[in-house]
């Protein structure tokens, strides 16, 4: 992976934001935190898309992916929370120390865990490659061997959902690839969609109801693509128009790319 060479000039973005700019408005998301805790989301929309295939299994990577809050609990940031609210609310879990407190943090372009999950998919959701992927991801983050063995022993069998959900978990800090995987496969099913009504209990005795309201009117799913920048309209208008005409819904966030078949 790429390694930052000097903390004064090239400090890792999360390190700079947390330690230099004193930002506290970013945290592990509520759906992802619940997935790793082994919980199902409290979803009031009536959809069953938030079922956790690893229900009842707390993932040992959670303690490395995120930092406990002041009460010693892991609490994710609701998807509808504003930056100003995030600055005030102190109950949410920031990214882990290995992320925000390492000035030369590096991220691999492709890890062995991802390769293992690809091999599992290629071989009809193979169990061995599936387990190898989980083990490789946990070893990369420093999970103790005994915890890895116990977690793998409790895993449900390899399937499309379990393999691709574990792949998504392993892609933490590689958001672009995780987004691509969702668009390609439709997994994980634990993501919240625009319009979903849900509840979160950040502290004991405090339950807050939320509605995931999209900032883009009419959007009902996670965006499938980014729109062309405005300068393409003026500097490359003809080619832009030709490209837009080939999209399923024009230059919109919900137009699928050619490889996005699910």
Feature locations, PLM:
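Hydrophobic-face positions in mid-chain alpha helices that act as interaction patches
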Residues: 1-119, 125-170, 174-176, 185, ...
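C-terminal functional modules
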Residues: 134-140, 144-262
């Amino acid at each position: 992976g790429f390694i930052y060479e000097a903390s004064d000039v090239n400090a890792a973005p999360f390190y700079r934001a947390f330690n230099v700019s004193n930002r506290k408005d970013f945290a592990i998301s509520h759906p992802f935190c619940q997935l790793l805790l082994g919980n199902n989301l409290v979803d009031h929309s009536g959809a069953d898309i938030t079922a956790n295939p690893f229900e009842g299994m707390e993932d040992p990577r959670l303690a490395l992916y995120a930092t406990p809050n002041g009460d010693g609990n892991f609490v994710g940031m609701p998807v509808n929370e504003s930056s100003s609210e995030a600055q005030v609310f102190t109950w949410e879990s920031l990214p882990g120390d290995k992320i925000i407190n390492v000035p030369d943090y590096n991220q691999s372009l492709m890890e062995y865990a991802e390769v293992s999950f690809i091999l599992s998919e290629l071989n009809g959701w193979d169990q061995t490659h599936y387990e190898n992927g989980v083990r490789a991801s946990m070893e990369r983050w420093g999970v103790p061997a005994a915890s890895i063995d116990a977690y793998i022993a409790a895993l449900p069998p390899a399937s499309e959902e379990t393999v691709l959900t574990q792949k998504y978990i392993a892609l933490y800090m590689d958001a672009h690839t995780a987004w691509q995987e969702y668009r390609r496969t439709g997994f994980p099913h634990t993501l919240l969609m625009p319009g979903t009504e849900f509840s979160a209990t950040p502290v004991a005795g405090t339950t807050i109801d939320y509605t995931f309201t999209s900032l883009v009117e009419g959007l009902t799913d996670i965006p499938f693509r980014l729109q062309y920048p405005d300068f393409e309209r003026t500097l490359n208008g003809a080619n832009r128009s030709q490209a837009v005409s080939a999209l399923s819904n024009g230059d919109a966030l919900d137009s699928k790319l050619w490889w996005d078949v699910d």
